[in-house]
């Protein structure tokens, strides 16, 4: 099925952001694990898998619309050098993705591509959950202090 070029462009923009986020979460997971924060590292690792599945969904949709998934135009990774920076960098990236998702949803709606819109809406819901989790981590650090937060982050299941 030949898709609308504007929708395909928006899907590719979101795909690029997801690909960056996959790498960012994965690297942060490994950094945190290396620092001894097993539980927190595991959360970020699982998050990278969630992002990978979302990217796969976009790739399949772009191909279905007879577009070419663009896996080459990648943005900049935001890599934190402390736990607080890691959380802040990932929150910034998730907020960037949120803005792109809203634009893509509006384009899909305007072009009457309701399947793409629904896919993007689902990804927006997941994105908002990620934003909420990251904001909660920042609030926890503010309330209980970084040393106490890191103590809980180091625990293994």
UniProtKB/Swiss-Prot annotation:
The coenzyme or cofactor needed here is: heme b
Write the record's keywords in alphabetical order, separated by commas. Answer: Heme, Iron, Iron storage, Metal-binding
Which residues are noted in the entry as heme b-binding? 52
Q: Which GO terms describe its biological process?
A: intracellular iron ion homeostasis; iron ion transport
In this chain the Ferritin-like diiron domain maps to: 1-145
**Pfam families cross-referenced by the UniProt entry:** Ferritin
Task: Please provide, alphabetically and separated by semicolons, the GO molecular function terms listed in this UniProt record.
Answer: ferric iron binding; ferroxidase activity; heme binding; iron ion binding
Q: Which InterPro entries does its entry note?
A: Bacterioferritin, Ferritin-like, Ferritin-like_diiron, Ferritin-like_SF, Ferritin_DPS_dom
Annotated residues for binding of Fe cation: 51, 94, 130
Q: How is the cofactor bound?
A: Binds 1 heme b (iron(II)-protoporphyrin IX) group per dimer.
Subunit and partners = Heterooligomer of 24 subunits, arranged as 12 dimers, that are packed together to form an approximately spherical molecule with a central cavity, in which large amounts of iron can be deposited.
Q: Which NCBIfam families match?
A: bfr
- Family in the record: Belongs to the bacterioferritin family.
User: What's this chain's function?
Assistant: Iron-storage protein, plays a role in protection against oxidative stress.
Annotated protein name in UniProt: Bacterioferritin B
State the species of origin: Neisseria meningitidis serogroup B (strain ATCC BAA-335 / MC58)
């Amino acid at each position: 099925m030949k898709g609308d070029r504007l929708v395909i462009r928006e899907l590719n923009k979101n795909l690029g952001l997801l690909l960056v986020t996959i790498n960012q979460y994965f690297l942060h997971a490994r950094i945190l694990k290396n620092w001894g924060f097993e539980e927190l590292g595991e959360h970020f690792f699982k998050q990278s898998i969630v992002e990978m599945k979302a990217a796969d969904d976009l790739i399949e949709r772009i191909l279905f619309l007879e577009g070419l998934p663009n896996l080459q135009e990648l943005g900049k990774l935001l890599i934190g050098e402390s736990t607080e920076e890691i959380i802040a960098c990932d929150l910034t990236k998730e907020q960037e993705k949120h803005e792109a998702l809203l634009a893509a949803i509006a384009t899909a709606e305007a072009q009457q591509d309701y399947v793409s819109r629904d896919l993007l809406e689902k990804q927006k819901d997941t994105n908002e959950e990620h934003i909420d989790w990251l904001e909660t981590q920042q609030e926890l650090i503010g309330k209980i202090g970084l040393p106490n937060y890191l103590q809980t982050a180091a625990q293994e299941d």
